């Protein structure tokens, strides 16, 4: 069937421009030809799983290590950059990573991105000063930008579509686990060794990933081109000009959210710096969208994606669910350590209900989706149980009994059982335009991680806005004492209170408890938004789509054979 004649239910996203037809000749391999089995498959999946875990853990782990890092470098002036550098580069380069995967061999691109991540980790580990550490974090973030989208692309190549729900579910469970355990692992390494091992740890684990991919992954054949791309054509295909609008927009928005706030932050919300960053982000985004419209099918972010309901729903659902879960993953360990007085080891044990349920729900839901072919009911389930679990945690108090917080965690852990659904939805929507899948997956991943960064920044602002007035009005602290609490960090709350006035410990813990409980409303709201977005996913069987893919692949092979005989 000629590429220019193809259409589908999803509308404009499924159309292939005739201009591309003479330059590219589809490869004749069937969709299943790159599938792996046995030891090679398991080895590749283990390597990819390690890469996902390390990349997600690096995003979540820094908070508990910051006090030790600032002590080593003898400065607190760059604390904001410690946390901002990684998500800034990861989010801003995410869409470009998708374009690179679409233009170059998957294996090579993944190895380069993951190599960048490991290089950044090494720079952080050996950093001798604050600027070197920040450069390392930015480098690692740039590498991480291509890790998750590359993982999803590789899984789609080595695992049939109807089996991907189970595999992607288990993979994404590692992301959720890393978000929860990242601060705990960081605390353990910092307490028992040095904060540098938070980054050195990535090197031997990352070596396993590199070996697995180099030895066992056979990348799918790429379409052959009748004429090679020139440098100007490649620049146009990668839409590097679009990057000049997109990257500043993301950087300025995240910096505004990182720096903006009252009291504990570098700039007030109404300061010229923060207002300027928000305005600059808005202008850059508008210019970027105008350019993307002009670029058409070569755009880094094809605007026709936003005419497809499945892709829109996938982006928004990933934004809401992972963003809401990251808030829980960040503040739940804080609640255990501040309110319950747990050390990092005990906190890790107390988080096990969340982690274990996370894995079990992924496996169970993955098997059910694999059998039935439909993931839609579980979209509602995931959003609903996260909303219920987080909503119940808004009632936290210092004496909340063990059975209660275990039950809340079980609900929240079960929520991530369907976090892989947005990526499955994209693959179904673009089943007849596989060359666009890496770009669309990068868009979904961007929304997931950008949502996580946005939600975490907002949650920290909510926490500070509830904490500071509470310490003054309820605990009777002076502004100078409040600043001491903010500077000391959450791990030193009990020790600092013992120095200031031990008799106020109970009231101080209540203030911290109320601030953390208040933050859980953000997670609840995000989950409820995700529940509403679930209505936007069309009901389409993954099994039926897999059979359709096989049939089309067989027809393509037959056409190629006939053409070869006639030639």
Swiss-Prot record:
Record keywords, A-Z: Cell membrane, Glycoprotein, Membrane, Transmembrane, Transmembrane helix, Transport
Signal sequence segment: none
GO molecular function: transmembrane transporter activity
Major location category of this protein: membrane
PROSITE patterns recorded: MFS
Regulation: induction: Expression is positively regulated by the oxaleimides biosynthesis cluster-specific transcription factor poxB.
InterPro entries: MFS (IPR011701), MFS_dom (IPR020846), MFS_trans_sf (IPR036259)
Entry GO terms, CC: plasma membrane
Mode of membrane association: Multi-pass membrane protein
Disordered, as annotated region: 1-24, 547-567
Bias kind Basic and acidic residues: ranges: 1-23
Glycosylation sites: 370
Cellular localisation: Cell membrane
TM segment ranges: 35-55, 77-97, 108-128, 141-161, 165-185, 197-217, 240-260, 271-291, 311-331, 349-369, 372-392, 410-430, 436-456, 515-535
Protein family: Belongs to the major facilitator superfamily. TCR/Tet family.
Function of the protein: MFS-type transporter; part of the gene cluster that mediates the biosynthesis of oxaleimides, cytotoxic compounds containing an unusual disubstituted succinimide moiety.
This protein's name: MFS-type transporter poxA
Taxonomic lineage of the native organism: Eukaryota, Fungi, Dikarya, Ascomycota, Pezizomycotina
């Amino acid at each position: 069937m000629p590429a220019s004649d193809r259409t589908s239910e999803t509308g404009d996203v499924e159309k292939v421009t005739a201009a591309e037809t003479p330059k590219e000749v589809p490869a004749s391999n069937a969709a299943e030809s790159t599938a792996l089995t046995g030891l090679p498959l398991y080895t590749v999946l283990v390597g990819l799983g390690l890469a996902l875990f390390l990349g997600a853990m690096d995003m979540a782990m820094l908070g508990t290590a910051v006090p030790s890092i600032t002590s080593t470098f003898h400065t607190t002036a760059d604390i904001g950059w410690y946390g901002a550098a990684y998500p800034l580069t990861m989010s801003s380069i995410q869409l470009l990573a998708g374009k690179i995967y679409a233009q170059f061999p998957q294996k090579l691109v993944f190895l380069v991105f993951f190599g960048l991540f490991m290089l950044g980790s090494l720079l952080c580990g050996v950093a001798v000063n604050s600027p070197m550490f920040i450069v390392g974090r930015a480098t690692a973030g740039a590498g991480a930008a291509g890790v998750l989208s590359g993982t999803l692309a590789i899984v789609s190549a080595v695992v049939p579509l109807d089996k991907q729900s189970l595999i992607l579910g288990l993979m994404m469970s590692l992301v959720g686990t890393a978000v929860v355990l990242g601060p705990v692992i960081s605390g353990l390494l910092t307490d028992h060794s040095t904060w540098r091992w938070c980054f050195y740890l990535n090197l031997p684990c990352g070596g396993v990933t590199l070996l697995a991919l180099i030895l066992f992954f056979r990348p799918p054949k790429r379409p052959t081109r009748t004429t090679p791309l020139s440098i100007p054509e490649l620049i146009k295909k990668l839409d590097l000009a679009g990057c000049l609008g997109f990257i500043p927009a993301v950087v300025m928005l995240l910096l505004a959210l990182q720096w903006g706030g009252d009291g504990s932050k570098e700039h007030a919300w109404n300061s010229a710096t923060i207002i300027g960053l928000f305005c600059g982000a808005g202008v850059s985004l508008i210019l970027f969208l105008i350019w993307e419209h002009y670029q058409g099918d070569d755009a880094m972010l094809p605007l026709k994606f936003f005419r497809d309901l499945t892709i829109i729903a996938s982006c928004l659902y990933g934004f809401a669910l992972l963003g809401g879960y990251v808030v829980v993953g960040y503040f739940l360990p804080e609640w255990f350590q501040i309110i319950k007085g747990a050390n990092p080891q005990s906190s890790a044990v107390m988080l096990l209900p969340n982690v274990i349920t996370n894995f079990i729900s992924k496996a169970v839901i993955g098997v059910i989706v694999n059998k039935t072919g439909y993931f839609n009911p579980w979209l509602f389930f995931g959003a609903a149980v996260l909303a219920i679990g987080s909503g119940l945690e808004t009632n936290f108090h210092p004496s909340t009994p063990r059975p209660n917080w275990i039950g809340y965690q079980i609900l929240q852990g079960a929520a991530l059982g369907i976090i892989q659904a947005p990526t499955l939805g994209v693959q179904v929507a673009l089943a007849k335009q596989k060359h666009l899948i890496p770009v669309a997956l990068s868009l979904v991943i961007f929304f997931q991680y950008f949502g996580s960064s946005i939600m975490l920044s907002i949650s920290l602002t909510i926490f500070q806005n509830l904490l500071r007035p509470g310490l003054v009005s309820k605990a009777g602290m002076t502004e100078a004492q409040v600043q001491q609490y903010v500077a000391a960090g959450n791990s030193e709350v009990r020790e600092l209170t013992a120095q200031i006035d031990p008799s106020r410990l109970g009231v101080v813990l209540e203030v911290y408890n109320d601030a953390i409980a208040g933050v859980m409303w953000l997670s609840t709201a995000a989950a409820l938004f995700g529940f509403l977005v679930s209505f936007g996913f069309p009901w389409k069987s993954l099994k039926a789509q897999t059979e359709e893919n096989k049939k089309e692949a067989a027809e393509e092979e037959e056409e190629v054979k006939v053409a070869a005989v006639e030639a």
